[in-house]
């Protein structure tokens, strides 16, 4: 098994910690909030309020299930527009009260169903990209599994983007890439090699800012590393003048 095929397999493993796991292990007193105030509540995106080392923060992330029943309830981690609108509602609330935002990302992509398109999937993702680029509080995004397409990017316009060691981040799935390029989805591993989807490759290109080492899908060490780094980096980002924070975020994405 090549390194990229191993990463692809491990990034999608159902045994990975989820957003709700991290929300309860890293933060204190996490309280989930629901609904987009327009249509409904989307179980594929979760979010709420918590404390990090005594500081209020907003935590948002894409939630996959750990079994079939849970995955059905979470739509296999593929958000509908109401999920992205819920996330944006919580981010604007965080901006109003001066709370830093931490997002966790694990999705193959936004849900491509007819209903999602009818309710404005593209608009919801685009609105998040626009609003996050100018959100007046620090944002840190962490890839904890799959980071697929615009569905992932809609929570990743951040001051810093981190990846766990054995996760992936790409414009689309390797299967989709292979199907478009060669009309053969079975060449996914070959496509993944060309796409440069691994944390190490993306770090070298400056697309991600930090790689969190993994020692199995769950270890207290991973949680401790993420928590310590979040405390350090949020403190550093909060110390910057607002104009500098926003300009550096803008320049971060302009360089691509």
UniProtKB/Swiss-Prot annotation:
Location(s), subcellular: Cytoplasm
EC number(s) per entry: 2.1.3.15
Molecular function GO labels: acetyl-CoA carboxylase activity; ATP binding; carboxyl- or carbamoyltransferase activity
Keywords: ATP-binding, Cytoplasm, Fatty acid biosynthesis, Fatty acid metabolism, Lipid biosynthesis, Lipid metabolism, Nucleotide-binding, Transferase
Cystine residue pairs: none
Pfam families named in the record: ACCA
InterPro entries membership: Acetyl_CoA_COase_a_su, ClpP/crotonase-like_dom_sf, COA_CT_C
GO cellular component entries: acetyl-CoA carboxylase complex
Subcellular location, principal: cytoplasm
Reaction(s) the record says it catalyses: N(6)-carboxybiotinyl-L-lysyl-[protein] + acetyl-CoA = N(6)-biotinyl-L-lysyl-[protein] + malonyl-CoA
One annotated GO biological process: malonyl-CoA biosynthetic process
Boundaries of every CoA carboxyltransferase C-terminal domain copy: 1-236
Biochemical pathway: Lipid metabolism; malonyl-CoA biosynthesis; malonyl-CoA from acetyl-CoA: step 1/1
Principal EC category: transferase
Subunit record text: Acetyl-CoA carboxylase is a heterohexamer composed of biotin carboxyl carrier protein (AccB), biotin carboxylase (AccC) and two subunits each of ACCase subunit alpha (AccA) and ACCase subunit beta (AccD).
Family classification: Belongs to the AccA family.
Protein role: Component of the acetyl coenzyme A carboxylase (ACC) complex. First, biotin carboxylase catalyzes the carboxylation of biotin on its carrier protein (BCCP) and then the CO(2) group is transferred by the carboxyltransferase to acetyl-CoA to form malonyl-CoA.
Name of this chain's protein: Acetyl-coenzyme A carboxylase carboxyl transferase subunit alpha
């Amino acid at each position: 098994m090549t390194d990229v095929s191993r990463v692809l397999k491990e990034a999608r493993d159902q045994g990975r910690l989820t957003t709700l796991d991290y929300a309860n292990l890293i933060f204190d007193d996490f309280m989930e909030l629901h609904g987009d105030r327009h249509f409904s509540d989307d179980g594929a995106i979760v979010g709420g309020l918590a404390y990090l080392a005594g500081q209020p923060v907003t935590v948002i992330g894409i939630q996959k299930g750990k079994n079939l029943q849970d995955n059905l309830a979470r739509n296999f981690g593929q958000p509908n527009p109401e999920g992205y609108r819920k996330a944006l509602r919580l981010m604007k609330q965080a901006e109003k009260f001066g709370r830093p935002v931490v997002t966790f990302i694990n999705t193959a992509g936004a849900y491509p169903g007819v209903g999602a398109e009818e309710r404005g999937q593209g608009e919801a993702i685009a609105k998040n990209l626009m609003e996050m680029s100018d959100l007046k509080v620090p944002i840190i995004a962490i890839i904890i599994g799959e980071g697929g397409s615009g569905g992932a990017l809609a929570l990743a316009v951040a001051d810093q983007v981190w990846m766990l060691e054995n996760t992936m981040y790409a414009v689309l799935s390797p299967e989709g890439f292979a199907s478009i390029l060669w009309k053969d989805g079975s060449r996914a591993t070959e496509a993944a090699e060309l796409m440069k989807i691994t944390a190490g490759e993306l770090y070298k290109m400056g697309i991600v800012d930090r790689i969190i080492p993994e020692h199995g899908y769950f270890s207290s060490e991973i949680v401790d590393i993420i928590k310590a780094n979040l405390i350090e980096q949020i403190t550093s980002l909060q110390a910057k003048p607002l104009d500098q924070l926003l300009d550096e975020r803008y320049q971060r994405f302009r360089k691509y």
